[in-house]
UniProtKB/Swiss-Prot annotation:
It comes from Oryza sativa subsp. japonica (Rice). Its cofactor is Mn(2+); Mg(2+). Disulfide bonds: none annotated. This is 1-deoxy-D-xylulose 5-phosphate reductoisomerase, chloroplastic. InterPro entries: DXP_reductoisomerase, DXP_reductoisomerase_C, DXP_reductoisomerase_N, DXPR_C, DXPR_C_sf, NAD(P)-bd_dom_sf. The gene is DXR. It catalyses: 2-C-methyl-D-erythritol 4-phosphate + NADP(+) = 1-deoxy-D-xylulose 5-phosphate + NADPH + H(+).
Length: 473
């Protein structure tokens, strides 16, 4: 059910997290949640402060150029996979299975699916295996009892970190969801491994810490999600300063054709009906709210160094154009393909090379059969997440991680039917508001993890019975 907000604390009404210039859509959304007014003077001061912050070095500053002398890998490239039993991990292993002459697995880490992990060990014969849930180590050993191949097994978080920095690995595929993937990614960077990045939190929460670290260790961060891979492919070989604008495409999610006034009636089952992609519950809800796209705006800023004013979102219902860039001469470059995550994952593993894919398992795009491609501007009233994401991005520092963690908790509460669909936006805004006075512009890894946990706890404390006011625990 939707949560009725009776009133807010007076100081919260005076100083809101959202920028009034971009957050006005909230005031037009007629639902059970009254949204407060914005203090323009506070916004102006925030922008002045934010503009003085030194941004971390982007992974790819508007262009991607292969360094002179770089050669293709001779023989199967050794890789580690963190999160091997999840969606990214299993698709990565599908790629390895199809290309044994190009890739080999040296280490695997999983959370708790030891049955699938054991099957993966038997098939790919890694040297090292980790299971994050330490209580399942004996079960994994039992599942491998009749296996001729006996890898080293290290349990717990330390095991996942050891997989990430395995000495034989050249590239590490990071497929763990949430801040749990941050420490292994940092360990891989410190060990000099290139990162096939499928964990959004690495940059959204950890960007201010991770990017300088990657620069220090001369590590490549290669985006494995479809939108950022599309941008990465489009900027290959661009001259310095040629990038003018980034255009992220979005399907629009389950409610792209719903009228705004019907959103207060949304049920969990409605939000889990994605029109194009088959994904997990959390990311499917994020597609419905467009929070996934808001988070991708932040990730694009960190990856490519574009200002937030130069990153746009366009609704593209067919999900064939995965994203676009505009160059200084007004040319627009796009990357097209069927909605298939294997393509961007493969490119992170093979870059800068292109690997042949059989059309038997990788259907080729037929534009004539496809027909028309359509586009429309996103509705800020229907998708308040965009205003929240842009505001968090401009605030920078720990605010982007707080936004991501609060959204993750809010979606969990929604899926568990503890809050309504529209309450997701309010929980995120209130959590970001509460973090304003504690924002750290250049956080350490410990501070990033601390505020991730804090945001989840604060979001969970916003109870219906108190009108979304925090409940002390």
């Amino acid at each position: 059910m939707a949560l009725k907000v009776v009133s807010f604390p007076g100081d919260l009404a005076a100083v809101s997290f959202l920028d009034s210039n971009r957050g006005g859509a909230f005031n037009q959304l007629k639902v059970d949640l009254p949204f407060q007014t914005r203090d323009r003077r506070a916004v102006s001061l925030r922008r002045t402060c934010c503009s003085m912050q030194q941004a971390p070095p982007p992974a790819w500053p508007g262009r991607a150029v292969v360094e002179p002398g770089r050669r293709s890998w001779d023989g199967p490239k050794p890789i580690s996979i963190v999160g091997s039993t999840g969606s990214i991990g299993t698709q990565t292993l599908d790629i390895v299975a199809e290309n044994p002459d190009k890739f080999r697995v040296v280490a695997l880490a999983a959370g708790s699916n030891v049955t699938l992990l054991a099957d993966q060990v038997k098939t790919f014969k890694p040297k090292l295996v980790a299971v994050r849930n330490e209580s399942l180590v004996d079960e994994l050993k039992e599942a491998l009892a009749d296996c001729d191949w006996k890898p080293e097994i290290i349990p717990g978080e330390q095991g996942v970190i050891e997989v990430a920095r395995h000495p034989d690995a050249v590239t590490v595929v990071t497929g763990i969801v949430g801040c749990a993937g941050l420490k292994p990614t940092v360990a891989a960077i410190e060990a000099g491994k290139d990162i096939a990045l499928a964990n959004k939190e690495t940059l959204i929460a950890g960007g201010p810490f991770v990017l300088p670290l990657a620069q220090k260790h001369k590590v490549k961060i290669l985006p494995a999600d479809s939108e950022h891979s599309a941008i990465f492919q489009c900027i290959q070989g661009l001259p310095e300063g040629a990038l003018r604008r980034i255009i992220l495409t979005a399907s629009g999610g389950a409610f792209r054709d719903w009228p705004v006034d019907k959103l207060k009636e949304v049920k969990v089952a409605d939000a889990l009906k994605h029109p194009n992609w088959n994904m997990g519950k959390k990311i499917t809800v994020d597609s419905a709210t467009l929070f996934n796209k808001g988070l991708e705006v932040i990730e694009a800023h960190y990856l490519f160094g574009a200002e937030y004013d130069d990153i746009e979102i366009v609704i593209h219902p067919q999900s064939i154009i995965h994203s676009m860039i505009e160059t200084q001469d007004s040319s627009v470059l796009a990357q097209l393909g069927w909605p298939d995550m294997r393509i961007p994952i493969l490119y992170t593993m093979s870059w800068p090379d292109r690997i042949y894919c059989s059309e038997v398992t990788w259907p080729r795009l037929d534009l004539c059969k496809l027909g028309s491609l359509t586009f429309k501007a996103p509705d800020n009233v229907k998708y308040p997440s965009m205003d929240l994401a842009y505001a968090a991005g401009r605030a920078g520092g720990t605010m982007t991680g707080v936004l991501s963690a609060a959204n993750e908790k809010a979606v969990e509460l929604f899926i568990d039917e503890k809050i309504g669909y529209l309450d997701i936006f309010k929980v995120v805004e209130l959590t970001c508001d509460a973090h304003r006075n504690e924002l750290v512009t250049r956080p350490s890894l410990e501070e990033i993890i601390h505020y991730d946990l804090w945001a989840r706890e604060y979001a969970a404390s916003l109870q219906p019975s108190t009108g979304l006011s925090p409940v002390p625990v």
